[in-house]
């Protein structure tokens, strides 16, 4: 029986770190990957875009000095936030559990999944906010992916050409991806048929657009208020954005659309509550300290109403 006020548990921490729902559904880690920071309050750099594209005079005279250039960065500050949940496991349940069932592990998995889902929603909110993009476009009636007469391939290619760093990833909500992959012109371009039937694969569309990846958000959450009938809603619905992602970027070097600063690792710990139930309960706590950030708006091009019904 655990009697310490708060005792880290290595076994439960391993579950919290390793536990994943279907990784096809959870995409937050792909768009906003984790980077470690040494303090809860941290600094990160934003780099002036023009410095990477301004061409200085590199010619050097026979006895002259080469021209000097300087590289600057705008240092910004941010703070991680704590996210966590508790799950009580009554001693009564532990003592009566079947041999092949561990209520402590089950509680850890359950709250870990909810924490992941909450992170998914936070990241989807960032991706949906048009203020996080230097480039944005509202697709009017007739140009949306749901309109068979539109030309989504041209729309996406021309948008990518407008981005200073280009794009290597297309981020889509499931409804936008369905509209895109069923669009007659996309089907025709990928299958070489008339386009009146079939569906395009992500690999085929990525090849058409010369992108490294197409990431589709499939996760869902209950959007109803507590106590009301469940309303299961896609987390990434209507999201459509071209992104430049760089997994090697961190808060000091490299440019990427966004990342998640994390202080420390995911943790799981326990404490004993003697006042819970007749025999007390072991309370499982899982959490992390992190902050999701969009750090380079120039690395994104967002489309609004891409899958709206005309």
Residue positions per predicted region:
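Assembly/oligomerization interface modules of large self-assembling protein complexes
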Residues: 22-86
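Short, well-structured alpha-helical interface segments that form or flank functional binding sites
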Residues: 102, 106, 200, 279
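Extended oligomerization regions of viral-like shell subunits
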Residues: 165-259
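A conserved acidic, glycine/proline-rich C-terminal tail/linker
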Residues: 258-272
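Intrinsically disordered, low-complexity linear regions
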Residues: 2-26, 49, 134-135, 141, ...
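Protruding loop/beta-arch "assembly-hinge" segments enriched in small, turn-prone residues
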Residues: 1-36, 269-310
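Alpha-helical scaffold segments that mediate packing/assembly in large oligomeric complexes
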Residues: 91-169, 174-191, 308-310
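Short, hydrophobic/proline-enriched secondary-structure or compact coil segments at domain edges
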Residues: 13-23, 27, 32, 44, ...
């Amino acid at each position: 029986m655990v009697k310490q006020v708060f005792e880290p548990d290595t076994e439960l921490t391993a579950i919290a770190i390793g536990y994943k729902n279907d990784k096809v559904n959870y995409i937050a880690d792909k768009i906003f990957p984790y980077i470690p920071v040494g303090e809860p309050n941290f600094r990160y750099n934003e780099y002036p875009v023009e410095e990477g594209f301004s061409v200085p005079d590199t010619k050097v005279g026979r006895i002259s000095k080469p021209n000097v250039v300087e590289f600057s960065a705008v240092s910004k500050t941010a703070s991680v936030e704590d996210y966590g949940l508790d799950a009580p496991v009554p001693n009564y349940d532990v003592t009566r559990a079947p041999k092949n069932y561990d209520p402590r592990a089950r509680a850890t998995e359950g709250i870990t999944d909810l924490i992941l889902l909450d992170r998914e929603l936070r990241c989807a909110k960032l991706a949906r906010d048009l203020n996080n993009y230097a480039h944005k476009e509202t697709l009017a009636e007739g140009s949306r992916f749901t309109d068979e007469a539109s030309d989504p391939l041209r729309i996406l290619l021309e948008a990518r050409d407008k981005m200073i760093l280009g794009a290597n990833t297309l981020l889509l909500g499931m409804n936008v991806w369905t509209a895109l992959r069923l669009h007659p012109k996309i089907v025709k371009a990928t299958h070489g048929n008339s386009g009146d039937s079939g569906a395009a694969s992500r690999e085929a569309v990525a090849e058409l657009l010369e992108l490294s990846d197409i990431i589709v958000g499939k996760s869902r959450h209950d959007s109803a208020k507590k106590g009301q009938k469940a309303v299961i809603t896609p987390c990434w619905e209507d999201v459509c954005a071209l992104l430049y992602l760089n997994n090697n970027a961190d808060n000091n070097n490299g440019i990427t659309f966004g990342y998640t600063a994390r202080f420390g690792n995911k943790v799981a710990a326990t404490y004993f509550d003697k006042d819970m139930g007749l025999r007390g309960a072991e309370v499982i706590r899982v959490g992390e300290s992190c902050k999701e950030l969009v750090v380079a708006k120039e690395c994104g091009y967002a489309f609004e109403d891409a899958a709206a019904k005309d």
